[in-house]
């Protein structure tokens, strides 16, 4: 006959073994699951950001998050600038970008704030125009957000 203490130890052992098996299955299958050619995200869905320069001048763009500095880039009229990332588990991912025309600062704006944009778009498009920066939703392709240039 199994006493109460032995029964608890047996249940604890089986529970630990079950947990280890689940973790091993997940680790083994991790690379099998793909999303748009990327490994299955542990944190959150894959998001793509694209900024198009629709101005007749060179547009400077410098984007960052808490963890990543994407560097400064200069784009001609019609050129695209973009990157992709996974939203973090806490849904607090934030990318902000500074825009400039030569020495003129056009502004620094939150280009992707997960709490604001999580349902707005997965492929987020921003168009830099003469007066403002316009953000579009996935469907329908309508302006849902815009930032007015400082100058």
From Swiss-Prot:
Chief location category: secreted
Q: Name one GO cellular component term.
A: extracellular region
Q: Name one GO biological process term.
A: rejection of self pollen
* Organism (species): Arabidopsis thaliana
What's the superkingdom here?
Eukaryota
Q: What is this protein called?
A: S-protein homolog 27
Residues carrying sugar: 91, 123
- What family does this belong to? Belongs to the plant self-incompatibility (S1) protein family.
Kinase found in the keyword field: no
Provide this UniProt record's keywords sorted from A to Z: Glycoprotein, Secreted, Self-incompatibility, Signal
| Pfam families listed in its UniProt record | Self-incomp_S1 (PF05938)
Question: Glycoprotein as a keyword?
Answer: yes
| Compartments where found | Secreted
């Amino acid at each position: 006959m199994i006493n109460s203490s032995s029964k608890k130890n047996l249940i604890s052992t089986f529970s630990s073994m079950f947990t280890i098996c689940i973790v091993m299955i997940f680790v083994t299958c991790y690379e099998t699951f793909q999303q748009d050619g990327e490994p299955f995200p542990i944190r959150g869905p894959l998001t793509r950001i694209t900024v198009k320069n629709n101005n007749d001048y060179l547009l400077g763009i410098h984007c960052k998050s808490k963890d990543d500095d994407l560097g400064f880039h200069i784009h001609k009229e019609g050129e695209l600038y973009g990157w992709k990332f996974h939203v973090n588990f806490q849904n607090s991912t934030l990318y902000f970008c500074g825009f400039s025309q030569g020495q003129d600062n056009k502004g620094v704006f939150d280009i992707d704030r997960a709490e604001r944009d999580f349902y707005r778009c997965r492929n987020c498009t921003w168009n830099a125009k003469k007066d403002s920066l316009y953000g579009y939703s996935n469907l329908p392709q309508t302006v849902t957000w815009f930032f007015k240039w400082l100058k």
